[in-house]
Amino acid sequence: IEEFMLLANQCAAHFARVKQIPFVYRVHEEPNAEKLERLHGLLQACGVNDHFAKDVPTPKELSAILEGVRGTPFEQIVNTGMLRCMSKACYEEKPKGHYGLVLKDYAHFTSPIRRYPDLAIHRMMTDLLSGTDKETMIVRYTDFAEKASKQSSEREVLAVQIERKAEDYYKAEYARRHLGECYEGIISGVTQRGIFVELENGVEGFVPASSLTATGTTLTEGIRLSDPASGKTWSLGDSMMITIVRADINLGKVDFEVAPETK
């Protein structure tokens, strides 16, 4: 069923491009150089080989990396890092192809849950198939396709933001019920201010650099925090024991400290 749906989406977009009529395309451009450089640093920190045939990796090459880390402690971190590396898919009135699906033509013509772009496309294609000529289609739907694309992209971004906030609230609510408990987690993010640690259950919390050492830390390319005085390091992908010390449900934020027995 999924293959039929993908094919229907592809055929609808191809039909519109060939007919040169206004349309709402689903566009996914390739990742830019800056994001790829960050991904490279992450993969190197996790000990993953990322030598690609060209400057921009193919989706097949990225899938091979994900398969290679499946079942390892780095699986979730690499998966998240790769998602953050990707360009945001959006709706546009001009066909630019879909990097992730490796397709020249793609649109959201059908889906398990009906979306507005689907309905916008149905409206335009129905008009064309009912006998409306190309010139009339251009006059009637050029502005409509542009506005529908822009609004659909904006609403999608907002929906994702709300979804993530809701998840953060529930994770903080869960963490609040387990204050003082110790867990093993994986370092999922490194900043000058401290490190982010993700637990196996998906809860992510922040460990301030000030709680790691009193002598100051040095950040290395966003992948490693080190204490020059003691020689200790905290790198992406490292495991560590933490204690849940704070959980703010309203902000959806959780704070950790290094577990006493591991300081």
Regions from the PLM with identified roles:
Residues 176-182, 216-242:
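Short nucleic-acid-contacting surface segments enriched for D/E, G, S/T with interspersed K/R
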Residues 199, 236-263:
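OB-fold/S1-family single-stranded nucleic acid-binding modules
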Residues 1-200, 206-213, 217-219, 246, ...:
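Append "with occasional cross-activation on large, charged helical scaffolds in nucleic-acid assemblies
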Residues 139, 223-225, 250:
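Hydrophobic transmembrane signal anchors and adjacent membrane-proximal interface regions, especially
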